[in-house]
Amino acid sequence: MSRIGKKPVAIPTGVTANIADGVLSVKGPKGELSMPLSSEVTYSLEDGQLSVQPVNDTKRARSFWGMQRTLVQNLIDGVTQGYSKTLQITGVGYRAASQGKTLKLQLGYSHDIDFAIPEGITIQTPEPTTVNISGIDKQKVGQVAAEIRRWRRPEPYKGKGIKYAGEFIFRKEGKKK
């Protein structure tokens, strides 16, 4: 039995959830999100709570149970609070600047990198070495952060590169003479 899946998802005031044609739509103060529903589980919306139950007792249905409940919770959290990730840039001459719909990155290459900011994502650079990514879709925020980080992953000798805020970079000792 799924410990996560058996808990119903509370729908706070100011948020409306609607199930129609195999799609769950959630509308809140920050915006609107929707996701296709899985046929492995059933969804019931009653008394300001959305509960998820597996269709049958197969391993596949049970594994989808907790995941689908978590995805529904992520939708509701996104339209009420939103999600954000912070990236830190370390290295001499490494910097970032937000210019309209693009993020300009200088990461030690012979050219600057212009990253197009996707729809529904806001990127702020309070400092040249800090990038704040925010939005209502948890998956999209994480994907954008991973794409930016991929341009220059932190290296283990000096720690230069782009890392998530709070991420531990395993450091190696250099060659001994």
UniProtKB/Swiss-Prot annotation:
Q: Does the keyword Ligase apply?
A: no
The protein's matches in InterPro entries, at most eight in alphabetical order, are given as:
Ribosomal_uL6-like, Ribosomal_uL6-like_a/b-dom_sf, Ribosomal_uL6_a/b-dom, Ribosomal_uL6_bac-type, Ribosomal_uL6_CS
Cellular compartments per GO CC: cytosolic large ribosomal subunit
Instruction: State the coiled-coil residue ranges.
Output: none
One of the GO biological process terms: cytoplasmic translation
Instruction: Give any GO molecular function from the UniProt entry.
Output: structural constituent of ribosome
Which keywords describe this protein according to UniProt? Ribonucleoprotein, Ribosomal protein, RNA-binding, rRNA-binding
Role noted for this protein: This protein binds to the 23S rRNA, and is important in its secondary structure. It is located near the subunit interface in the base of the L7/L12 stalk, and near the tRNA binding site of the peptidyltransferase center.
Assembly state and interactors?
Part of the 50S ribosomal subunit.
Q: Which family does it belong to?
A: Belongs to the universal ribosomal protein uL6 family.
The record ties this protein, via PANTHER family, to:
60S/50S RIBOSOMAL PROTEIN L6/L9, LARGE RIBOSOMAL SUBUNIT PROTEIN UL6M
What's the protein here called?
Answer: Large ribosomal subunit protein uL6
Q: Gene of origin?
A: rplF
